[in-house]
Amino acid sequence: MTIKTVKDAINDALVQSFEEDKNVILMGEDIAGGKGREQYQGTQDAWGGPFGVTQGLYTKFGGERVRDTTIAEAGFFGAAIGAAMTGLRPIVELMYVDFAGVCFDQMMNQAAKVRYMFGGKQKVPMVVRTVVGAGFRAGSEHSQTLYSLYTHIPGLKVVAPYDAYDAKGLLLSSIKDDDPVIFMEHKRLYMTSCEVPDDLKPIPLGKGRIRREGSDVTIIAIQRMNLFAEEAADELEKINISCETVSYTHLTLPTSHCV
C-alpha cells in the first residue's frame, strides 16, 4: 500500500498499461514536451502535458508510442479512431474538455457509432483523457465539466474518478475496454492523495463506490463534490442523521446497486 496522488496514480496506470500491451499508444498536445524537444536532450518529458501527468512516458517508451501532436484535435482524434479500428489501443489527451467542440464530430458520429454501424463486430478501443473543472483562476473556456455533453451520446462510456484508488483502477479498465471511453480528470483533485494497493487490479466499469455507511439518507456525488458530501454527512451526524455517501464514477451506466 502506497500513498499516491491522483496525478501519480494516473501516470502509474499509463506505465502499467504500456508495459502490459504493446498496442497501447498515447497522443496529444505537448504530452512529450512539445515540438522542438529534440534540441533539448534529457528534457523531453519536462512538461508532460499542462498538468505533468504524462511525465516520463516519452523517455521510457519512445516517440513511436508517445506522440506529440499538432494543435488540431479533429485530425488526431480521427487518427486515433482509425488506429483503434485497426488493432491499436490509443489513449488521446484532450488538453481541456472545453475544447470538445473542435473534435465533437469525430466522437459523436464516428467513435460512438462504429460498433452499431458494423452490427456489433467492430471494436473501437480508445480512451480520451481530458481535464475538467474550475478553481485555478483560468478563463471560462478552461473551467467547465461538460459531463452531460458526452453522457447523452449512445456508444460512449463516461468515467469520472474521485481519488487515486479510483483513478488508477478505472483507467486500467478503461484502456482494456473495447469501446470508446471518456476519462474525465478533475484538475482540483490531481494533488489529492490516498492509499493505493501496489498490486491494484482494474476496477470494473459501471460500479459506484460506497464511501460511508449510513441508514437514514443517501448523498450521491461526482468527483470533487464528494468532498462536500462528506462535509454534509458530518453535519448531519451532529443531529443524529445517519448518512450514506456514494461516489458515482461511471456516469453512463446505472449504479443503483450502491443505494
Per-region residue spans from a language model:
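Short helix-loop-beta junction
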Residues: 56-63, 228-245
